[in-house]
């Protein structure tokens, strides 16, 4: 016969949805009734009247049919609602007699043995560490253990009866000051059928001690698997240790052992549970950071394989594989070694676990692979210390005849890691009788210090001024050039601003050109660190004593990836052109902006780490079998990515042309942006592991295993991207001409800088940097 399952809540919800749909349809019918039933005739003739009457009759028929359908819909919704109510009443009515019947069946066993025939055990109260109650003698799961109070262990899970699963152990209490408490043991599974309960997690450590051990997984009876071990308790912080993972439960006559629990920080994973007669040992638990993985559980007394070793925590070895079954079975594979992590066990990777041995008949387990080597650190460019010292200012010269201001002195050199000083300002050149007045050139920026010093900025050009009516020219001094970045890397210095050319008479005035920005350091940006060597592979297990092959050695770990190179240093910004200013009828022209500096070359990527040593192959059985092959050396690490080339400096803005008289004004041209630096060379791929493992010895009938080969070399790092070219400087603004004067002309924008060249050849070629943005016309 078929079974019908009804959910009253779902029926009630469906009835509500149907009622909403009916309301929507009724509203639509009502809205359409008046326009459709009273159709107005298109004209006064008999045909139009007949057509209108025909369509009106159609609408009236539809409304009559809609009313009948609405009544049917309401009856259907009511029936659905009543059905849901009937199911609720029926369930409530039948539940009590069934519960009473179950009570009658359980009463004799409860009175005689203190345990029901059918039913689940009660859960222990949390915070008390009380054990879970046992399940029914015939059918039922054990109850879960209650969690422990602070510092107190968790309660054990309740045992099942004939059929059922054991209860989960309670969590151990956290340590307030002392260690965390152990988790409760998982309950035993059913004698006939059922799995063991999972062990409870250990409690967290107190301020200075260790976390609690995870509870052992529950065992089981005839058919079923052992329970999982509980996780170790958490560490309290830096300097404390977590708890060891709980061991897995023993499997039934036909069943597997349970997996070991994961270890807390710095604590080992739990050992896998053993199989009994037929089955596979449980896998070892994962080790916490800095601690090994748990060993795999042993195989059964008759037929079955050993469990696999657990993964090692960061920097620690993988667990060893469990031994194969006593009569027939393979050893379990060793766990993989943990990867290298900076600050954990000296940054070294863990070795792979050894494969488990076979007993009489069977092959040894394979060794685990070594952990991955430590990744290299990315290159970091040094910073620059500000330099408060400046070059001497040029001498001011004022008098009749042509006058030129003195040049500014160069900026002082920077110390180690210090920027060069700013160049001195050019002196005033002033002609009082209308002859030429020329400002002095700004001083060059000071030499950058080694180890990251920035180039010094160039000094500003001096003011050139003429005050008479003899038609002399006023020319501002050129800005000083910025200095190149330091030998070991540094940003180029900015070019100095051109000086103002000011003519108060009838002659022309020209602003000084801006200084050239210094180049970003031509030396490479900081190189990335080399990757670490991969961990050693584990040894293969021994084959069965009579017949069986040795296990293969584990492969060496992969070398760490090289660190990325640092970006090249940016070129200095070109100096702005000086202002041309006239008060009379002469032309005022702004100075040209300075050229942006070249970007520096990106740093080389770090070399990939070497692959680890392969593990040795296991020996074959004494009578018949092949020796295990040695593990291959690990694959070399990937080279680091080359650094991005430094950006070219932006060109300086052109100077403004300004007049308060009637002369023409011309804005200065913007400076050309600097060329972007070349991308850094990609790092060399790491060498493959050169030492493969030795092959295992062969049996009396058989031969030795082959030695492991050399690992493949790592992939070369990708070349860095070329640096972006600097933006061209904006053209200077031409001022509005005075009344009756000449036109005003804006300066041209500077050209954008070229993109940097691609990365070096040892890595994958870098992409070409994008060109600089064209400066806007004034």
Swiss-Prot record:
Segments forming domain PE: 1-92
Gene3D superfamilies assigned: HP0062-like domain
Compositionally biased tracts (Gly residues): 402-429, 436-510, 718-763
Region Disordered, residue ranges: 125-163, 372-510, 718-778
InterPro entries membership: PE-PGRS_N, PGRS_rpt
Coiled-coil ranges per UniProt: none
Family indicated by similarity: Belongs to the mycobacterial PE family. PGRS subfamily.
Name of the featured protein: Uncharacterized PE-PGRS family protein PE_PGRS46
Lineage of origin: Bacteria, Bacillati, Actinomycetota, Actinomycetes, Mycobacteriales
């Amino acid at each position: 016969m078929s079974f019908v399952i009804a959910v009253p809540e779902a029926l009630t919800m469906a009835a509500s949805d149907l009622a909403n749909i009916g309301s929507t349809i009724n509203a639509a019918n009502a809205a359409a009734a008046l326009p459709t039933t009273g159709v107005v005739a298109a004209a006064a003739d008999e045909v139009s009247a007949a057509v209108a009457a025909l369509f009106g009759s159609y609408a009236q028929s539809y409304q009559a049919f809609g009313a009948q359908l609405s009544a049917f819909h309401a009856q259907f919704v009511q029936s659905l609602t009543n059905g849901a109510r009937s199911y609720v009443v029926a369930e409530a009515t039948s539940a009590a007699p069934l519960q009473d019947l179950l009570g009658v069946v359980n009463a004799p066993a409860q009175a005689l043995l203190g345990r029901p025939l059918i039913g689940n055990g009660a859960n222990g109260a949390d915070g008390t560490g009380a054990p879970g109650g046992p399940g029914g003698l015939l059918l039922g799961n054990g109850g879960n253990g209650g969690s422990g109070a602070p510092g107190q262990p968790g309660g054990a899970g309740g045992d099942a009866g004939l059929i059922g699963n054991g209860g989960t152990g309670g969590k151990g209490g956290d340590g307030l000051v002392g260690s965390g408490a152990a988790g409760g043991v998982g309950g035993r599974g059913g004698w006939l059928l059922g799995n063991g309960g999972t062990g409870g997690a250990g409690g967290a450590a107190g301020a200075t001690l260790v976390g609690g051990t995870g509870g052992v997984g529950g065992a089981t009876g005839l058919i079923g698997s052992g329970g999982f071990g509980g996780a170790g308790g958490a560490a309290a912080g830096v300097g404390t240790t977590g708890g060891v993972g709980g061991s897995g439960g023993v499997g039934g006559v036909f069943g597997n052992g349970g997996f070991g629990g994961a270890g807390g920080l710095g604590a080992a994973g739990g050992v896998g549970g053993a199989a009994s007669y037929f089955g596979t040992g449980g896998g070892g638990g994962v080790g916490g950071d800095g601690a090994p993985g748990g060993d795999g559980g042993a195989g059964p007394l008759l037929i079955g394989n050993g469990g696999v070793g657990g993964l090692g925590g960061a920097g620690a070895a993988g667990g060893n594989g469990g031994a194969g079954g006593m009569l027939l079975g393979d050893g379990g594979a060793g766990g993989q070694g943990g990867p290298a992590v900076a600050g954990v066990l000296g940054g070294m990777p863990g070795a792979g676990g050894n494969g488990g041995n076979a007993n009489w008949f069977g092959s040894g387990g394979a060794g685990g692979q070594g952990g991955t080597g430590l990744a290299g650190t990315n290159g970091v460019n040094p910073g620059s210390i500000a330099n408060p010292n400046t070059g001497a200012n040029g001498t001011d010269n004022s008098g009749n005849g042509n006058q030129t201001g003195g040049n500014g002195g160069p900026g002082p050199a920077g110390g180690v890691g210090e920027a060069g000083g700013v160049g001195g300002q050019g002196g005033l050149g002033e002609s009082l009788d209308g002859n030429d007045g020329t400002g002095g050139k700004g001083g060059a920026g000071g030499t950058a210090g080694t180890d990251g010093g920035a180039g010094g900025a160039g000094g500003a050009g001096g003011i050139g001024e003429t005050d008479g009516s003899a038609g002399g020219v006023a020319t501002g001094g050129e800005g000083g050039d910025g200095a190149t970045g330091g030998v070991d890397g540094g940003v180029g210095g900015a070019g100095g601003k051109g000086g103002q050319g000011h003519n108060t008479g009838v002659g022309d005035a020209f602003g000084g050109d801006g200084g050239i920005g210094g180049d970003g350091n031509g030396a490479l940006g900081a190189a990335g660190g080399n990757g670490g060597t991969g961990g050693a592979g584990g040894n293969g297990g021994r084959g069965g004593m009579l017949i069986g092959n040795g296990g293969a050695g584990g492969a060496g770990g992969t070398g760490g990836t090289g660190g990325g190179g640092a970006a090249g240093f940016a070129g200095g910004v070109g100096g702005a052109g000086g202002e041309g200013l006239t008060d009379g009828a002469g032309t005022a022209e702004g100075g040209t902006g300075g050229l942006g500096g070249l970007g520096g070359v990106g740093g080389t990527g770090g070399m990939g780490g070497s692959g680890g040593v392969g593990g040795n192959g296991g020996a074959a059985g004494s009578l018949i079998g092949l020796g295990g092959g040695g593990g291959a050396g690990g694959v070399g690490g990937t080279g680091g990515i080359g650094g991005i080339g430094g950006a070219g400096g932006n060109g300086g803005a052109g100077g403004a042309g300004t007049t308060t008289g009637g002369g023409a004004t011309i804005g200065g041209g913007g400076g050309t942006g600097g060329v972007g630096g070349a991308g850094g060379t990609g790092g060399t791929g790491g060498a493959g592991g050169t030492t493969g493992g030795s092959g295992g010895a062969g049996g009396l009938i058989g031969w030795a295993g082959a030695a492991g080969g050399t690992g493949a070399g790592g992939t070369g790092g990708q070349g860095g991207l070329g640096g972006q070219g600097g933006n061209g400087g904006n053209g200077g603004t031409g001022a509005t001409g005075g009344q009756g004067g000449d036109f005003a002309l804006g300066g041209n924008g500077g050209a954008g800088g070229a993109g940097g060249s691609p990365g070096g050849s040892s890595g994958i070629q870098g992409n070409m940097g994008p060109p600089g943005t064209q400066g806007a016309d004034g």
